[in-house]
Structure formats: structure tokens, C-alpha cells
Amino acid sequence: MAAADALLGSLVTGLYDVQAFKFGNFVLKSGLSSPVYIDLRGIISRPSILNQVAEMLFQTAENAEINFDTVCGVPYTALPLATIVCSTHEIPMLIRRKEKKDYGTKRLIEGAVNPGDTCLIIEDVVSSGSSVWETAEVLQKEGLKVTDAVVLVDREQGGRDNLQARGIRLHSVCTLSTVLCILEQQKKINAETVERVKRFIQENAFVAANPNDSLPSVKKEPKELSFGARAELPGTHPVAAKLLRLMQKKETNLCLSADVSESRELLQLADALGSRICLLKIHVDILNDFTLDVMKELTTLAKRHEFLIFEDRKFADIGNTVKKQYEGGVFKIASWADLVNAHAVPGSGVVKGLEEVGLPLHRACLLVAEMSSAGTLATGSYTEAAVQMAEEHSEFVIGFISGSRVSMKPEFLHLTPGVQLEAGGDNLGQQYHSPQEVIGKRGSDIIIVGRGIIASANQLEAAKMYRKAAWEAYLSRLAV
């Protein structure tokens, strides 16, 4: 037992060291503010810990003397854990899809399904037990028996009892209380943190009234989250999180649209105004004297002043073509642009082509959901389709170019062009709205300003004014 305790202690501290256990203030999916967040997705990049977790899950099942024929991991974090267990111990594995595909086999369960077999469910973390139960229901519809589930961490918020009431025994490698005890003993966290987390657990249990009810989730109307809080949401893309954090740090939600034709002017704008902005948007194909050396200088300035570079390319072709446009040609956009954007018109292939290039480089994309020009066709069902496409490709798409908030998911960013301090328009159909209108009333996150700053006699003062107006509109929105 002492050896097992030492092994568990080593695993828990190892997981803490790779930030799988985070303590602070985190907004959960339900809208609750939690003092602890468990995120095991990162262990896929740490084979030693991944293997250790998988083996401890298997040993937990062995110690409980569970009889089973197959294993199914709850998508998605538990999938690699289930794969290692099955591969190491030569056990047949099943994969549950989150949604049925409209092509191929169209099955929700992949693998050799033998009705009457008993399937063991593997999960990383259990709160209410809903994720385990959803997987069990799908397996049972295929004629499989589900009697047990093993989990790395039981958050002790009612999941064990809820599953027991539905005929599923939950076996955990450890509970959250055990994690707290180990980390306090190792001086990773203090007693105050331990008490805060324990109080949260006690006050936020998920308990169903009877076994026939669907498993509960805490319902709470989420309030407007700060940029900083949104950066820490588990579903926020790393590029979006980076942008949100620097917005919070610099207190700016201003994107400068530097639509200039000379590289020298572009670099001067970036250097002079970089400290006031969160994003620099450019059209690289209108630079008369483009070179990759200019882009190197621009990325150096971006690091110095802490802003991201957004190439306003508006890709709108088939996947294979946009892939070549993104990574190759004269501009080699993927090598220097943190963000690009694309139209939804070509269908999901445009995103798939871009993400083949961008994902390995830690880049991201915005979809054009609405436009600020008069007579735009990007409205209604087109906008809805763009939102759906973003949700289906959230591993690469981090938000939208839009005139207003088109998605209620706080993980997505909304950037709005056509902003001036006073509403109006130009003779080419551009329509302008004020920062207060765009941020305060329409729910956008970032204003995109070009001529309002660049055409000003004092560009720095103009940038300060736009930054102040947009940030104050954001703060007012938080206060509502």
C-alpha cells in the first residue's frame, strides 16, 4: 500500500507540475466560478505521464475485479488513455463518436460490437457523471452491457451516486480531496486554497432527484466575462487566449487597419502605434515593395509591442488552392501572420485547407460572418452557416469578422470593421459605427479602425482616442 501511495503521490505532483491541476478563479461551462480547474488534455504531449495515467486506470479496474470484454474512452481526452490500456493489455477497443457522420458507415460506435459483451468506460474527470452516462447510453443502444467505469479524478460532486443510481459503479484512481491532500503535503498549495476548493465542492453538488431524470448540470445564467476570464476557458484556442490576455494586460481592444502601400509606412505605424493596439491588420498584397525581410521586421515589432499580426486575406477558394496561397507564393503568409480570415462561401474545405498549414504553426483563422459594406449578402442564413462552420472547426477558427456578436460562445472573438468615433459612411459604400455602438450595444470585442487613425494629422492621439473609447465601452458592458 505504501508503494501504491507513493506512486499516486508522484503522479499527482507530476500532473500539477505540467499544469493539469490549476488553482485560481476559473469560469466553468455552466457559468460557475470555480477555484480549481482540471485539464488533462496536455498530457498527450507527455508520453511518460500519459502511460502512467493509463496504467493506473487499468490497475484500478483490476483491483476492483471488474469483468469486461471491451473498453471505450469518453471522447475526447480519455481516448488516448483507452488506446494505451487496450494496446498494452491487448483488449478490444471501441470508439464513440460525439456525432454521427453523414458519410461512410454513419455509426456512432466504431469497432467490433458484439451484443451482450460488457464494455468498461474510461474517463479522465467526473463531476456529475453525465459524460459517462451519455457514453453508456450509446453503448447500451448497440446491445452492450455497461456495469462499471474507471476515472482518474472524481471531483466528488455527485457523479458517483448519480451513476450508481443508473446501475454503473464508478471507480476512481483518486478523488479531488486526495489530490488536495497530496499537493498540500508537497507544499504545492496552501491550506487556504484547500479549504476554498472543499467549500466549492460541498456547495456545488450535482444530484438528480431520481434515476429516471437526466443527469443534472448546474444551471446559472452566465454573466459577461472579462477578456482575462475568457482566455482561461477550457475551450479557448491558444491563439485566442494569447490575444485575450494581451488585451487585458494592455487594456486595449483596438485593431489598427494599416492599409498602406509602402513597407516603410507600415513599419512606422507598427512602431509608433504598436503599444496602443492588440492587433495589426494588413493587406500584404497592396504593398508595392514587399519582401520577407519586411515581415521579419514587422514580427520583431509585434513581439516588442505585444500585438498580433492579422493578414486580411479573405481566402475564398477550394481547400487545395487556399493551402497553396497560405503557405507558398511570394508572400508565404503562414510564416508570419498570427491570424488570417476566410469567407464561408466555398464551404468547410476552405478551413480544412488552411488548417493543414496553420495548425502545425500555431496559427488561427477568423470567418467573415458579416461585412460593413452597403448591400452585403453576408447576412441571415449565410451568417448562421459561418457560425456553424466555426463551431465545427474550433481547433483552428477562433471567431468572426462581423458587425455584431453572432455567437454566444465566449471562446469566440468578434472583430468589427467600419468603426469611427462618429457614425457615417463614404462614397464607396462603407458604413461606419461608433465604438460605443459596436462594443457596448452590438457585443463585439475588437474594433478595426483604419482611416480614422491613419488619415489623422496626429495618428498617436487618434489611436489613443479610439483605444479609450473602445475600452470604456467594454468596461461599461461588463458593469451591466
From Swiss-Prot:
Question: What's a BP term from Gene Ontology annotated to this protein?
Answer: 'de novo' pyrimidine nucleobase biosynthetic process
Q: Which residues carry this modification: Phosphoserine?
A: S214
- Give the modified residues of type N-acetylalanine: A2
Q: Where does this protein act, in terms of pathway?
A: Pyrimidine metabolism; UMP biosynthesis via de novo pathway; UMP from orotate: step 1/2; Pyrimidine metabolism; UMP biosynthesis via de novo pathway; UMP from orotate: step 2/2
List keywords of the entry alphabetically: Acetylation, Decarboxylase, Glycosyltransferase, Lyase, Multifunctional enzyme, Phosphoprotein, Pyrimidine biosynthesis, Transferase
Q: State its Enzyme Commission number(s).
A: 2.4.2.10, 4.1.1.23
**List of residues that carry Phosphotyrosine:** Y37
Complex and partners: Homodimer; dimerization is required for enzymatic activity.
The name this protein carries in UniProt is Uridine 5'-monophosphate synthase
Q: Which organism is it from?
A: Bos taurus
Q: What is the lineage of its organism?
A: Eukaryota, Metazoa, Chordata, Craniata, Vertebrata
